[in-house]
UniProtKB/Swiss-Prot annotation:
The lineage of its organism: Eukaryota, Metazoa, Chordata, Craniata, Vertebrata. This is Uncharacterized protein C4orf17. It comes from Homo sapiens (Human). The gene is C4orf17. Residues 286-299 have a biased composition (Basic and acidic residues). Pfam families: SPATIAL. Residues 90-117, 132-161, 235-359 are annotated as: Disordered. Residues 245-259 have a biased composition (Low complexity). Residues 151-161 have a biased composition (Polar residues). Coiled coil: none annotated.
Length: 359
């Protein structure tokens, strides 16, 4: 085989080199191969084809590194590279200048069917799946770990910036250790001590009320709540809550008297006045007349004493009971009124007892 290429082959090679020089941005320019690696093969229509026997591994690594670096810099996919539309590229000699027989590592030709389909389907680079996949991978990448810093100031600033970003993007969980330290510091300031032994002794020997008050004070200071006003409100509401009744109940019982009490007192006085003359009229001595006078003075005292007892007991026991006439003859009287009537009945008998004994 003749190793000296004819003039036509030299012209074709000159055209190909000119095309390669114009399209440096997309094609990878190789160095001039060794003469032992170059050979010419008779192609179609008796046109010689220049081929170069390259190592697949070496060229593959060279092509992969160079093309990937270039695409990462310009961020354009393979399908959008500006390939030449000249007729010289379509010629068979230029096709023969394809470097390696393995076509999987070579970018697609501009006028081949795969490249046409890609161009028809994706008119812009944003619609290209290669670009979208690359952006998705970048978004899914975890943040790089913080590198070792030479100066402490830059390292601290980087750490604070990352901490702020993490706090902004995550839910804040309270740090219980910080709260315990703050509570312990407040407790030491209240007890006026710095030793943990004294704090433990106070916790062991303090009463429950003291512990509750100190804990409420510490938590209120931490929460910035005015505990004194809240405590005053609670103390003012405690007596009303204990009794379960409005504070007007604590007023003297003579303020709120039932309406039927005046009628009861009048009935009692009338009954006593009606009974006393019948008992006194049977006695003719003057001494016996003086004793009923004392008895006449005693029933009003008993009634006055009952004035203080009856309304309060009736108010607490049966506040909503309907008024009923309270007489000696009515058997359905209240127990408190019945007791007062019995006491009244006993008093005149005691007052008249000496006169009957004399008789």
């Amino acid at each position: 085989m003749n190793l000296n290429p004819p003039t036509s082959a030299l012209q074709i090679e000159g055209k190909g080199s000119h095309i390669m020089a114009r399209n440096v941005s997309c094609f990878l320019v190789r160095h001039t191969p060794h003469p032992r690696r170059v050979c010419h093969i008779k192609g179609l229509n008796n046109i010689p084809i220049c081929t170069v026997n390259d190592d697949e591994n070496a060229f593959g690594t060279l092509w992969g590194v160079g093309q990937s670096n270039y695409l990462e810099k310009n961020r354009i996919p393979f399908a959008n590279c500006s390939y030449p539309s000249s007729t010289a590229v379509q010629e068979s000699p230029v096709r023969g200048m394809s470097p390696a027989p393995n076509g999987a590592k070579v970018p697609p030709r501009p006028h081949s069917e795969p490249s046409r389909k890609i161009k028809e389907c994706f008119k812009t680079s944003s619609e290209n799946p290669l670009v979208i996949k690359k952006e998705e991978i970048k978004a899914k990448r975890p943040p790089s770990p913080p590198k070792a810093c030479s100066t402490p100031g830059s390292c601290s600033s980087g750490m604070t910036s990352t901490k702020n970003d993490v706090k902004a993007n995550t839910i804040c969980i309270p740090n219980y250790l910080d709260q315990e330290i703050k509570i312990l510091a407040k407790l030491c300031s209240i007890l006026h001590t710095d030793s943990l032994a004294e704090v433990l002794q106070w916790l062991l020997h303090a009463t429950s009320k003291e512990k509750e008050w100190v804990s409420a004070l510490i938590h209120s200071e931490l929460a910035e709540i005015n505990l004194l006003t809240h405590h005053r409100r609670n103390t003012s509401m405690e007596p009303a809550a204990e009794t379960g009744k409005p504070p007007t109940v604590k007023s003297p019982p003579t303020v709120k008297l039932p309406p039927n009490f005046t009628a009861k007192s009048k009935v009692l006085t009338r009954d006593t006045e009606g009974d006393q003359p019948t008992r006194v009229s049977s006695q003719g001595s003057e001494e016996n007349k003086e004793v009923p006078k004392e008895a006449e003075h005693k029933p009003p005292l008993l009634i006055r004493r009952n004035n203080m007892k009856i309304p309060v007991a009736e108010y607490f026991s049966k506040p909503n009971s309907p008024p009923r006439p309270n007489t000696q003859e009515s058997g359905s009287a209240k127990p408190v009124s019945a007791r007062s009537i019995q006491e009244y009945n006993l008093c005149p008998q005691r007052a008249c007892y000496p006169s009957t004994h004399r008789r």
